[in-house]
């Protein structure tokens, strides 16, 4: 589950091996707010001309359980006499709503379709300021200039913190869109390499 945590990462810098002029114009700071310690999404090959990032089953397990757990409690609350109070109904609604909200934001898909020549992100994420990204997130694949890998340290009150990594798309106009944000460095680098090969674009890796 994505948790909104304090970002304690030092200011990132452009990798020394990158000489592309656009690299000096883009931001090298984390793009999204929070993150997860485990693998939140993975790159899936849908066909010869399409790949997409999907949330992992483990990542959506908890919100799904919250949503499903709320249903029988809501039903019991509706059927119970008013004299017994509305506590169960409120509890069920709360569990259902929290699960539904988390599930909505955690079932993001980032689709790269060579046949249509379009990249589409089906959900908006929270940016580094805690606000929703602008919509719609649909751009031409030809506008993608490079892939950017960043690291950040996340910490919450009473937590020792953990490392989280971002994979972002970089566009010709110096804009960025996040497509992966989790704590498994090896797997996010593997996904970045596979996506770079699919798109024929370079990877700008600022993770040290």
Regions found by a protein language model. Name each.
Residues 51-53, 69-72, 110-112, 119, ...:
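Short, structured motif recognition centered on aromatic/hydrophobic residues
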Residues 38-54, 113, 155-161:
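Short, ordered beta-strand-loop transition motifs
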Residues 6, 33-35, 120-187, 206-207:
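Non-transmembrane, membrane-adjacent beta-strand/coil modules in membrane-associated proteins
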């Amino acid at each position: 589950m994505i948790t909104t945590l304090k970002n304690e990462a030092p200011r990132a810098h452009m990798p020394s091996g990158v000489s592309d002029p656009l690299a000096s114009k883009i931001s090298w700071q984390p793009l999204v707010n929070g993150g997860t310690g485990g693998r939140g999404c993975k790159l899936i090959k849908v066909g010869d001309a399409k790949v997409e990032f999907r949330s992992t089953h483990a990542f959506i397990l908890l919100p799904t359980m919250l949503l499903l757990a709320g249903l029988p409690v809501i039903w019991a609350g509706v059927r119970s006499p008013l004299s017994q109070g509305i506590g169960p109904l409120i509890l069920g609604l709360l569990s259902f709503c929290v699960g539904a909200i988390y599930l909505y934001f955690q079932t993001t898909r980032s689709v790269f379709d060579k046949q249509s020549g379009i990249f589409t992100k089906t959900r908006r994420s929270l940016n580094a300021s805690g606000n929703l990204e602008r919509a719609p997130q649909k751009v031409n694949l030809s506008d993608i200039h490079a892939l950017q890998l960043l690291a950040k340290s996340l910490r919450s009150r009473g937590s020792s913190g953990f490392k989280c990594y971002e994979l972002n798309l970089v566009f010709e106009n110096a804009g960025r869109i996040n497509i992966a944000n989790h704590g498994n460095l090896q797997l996010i680098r593997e996904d970045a390499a596979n996506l770079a090969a699919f798109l024929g674009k370079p990877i700008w890796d600022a993770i040290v």
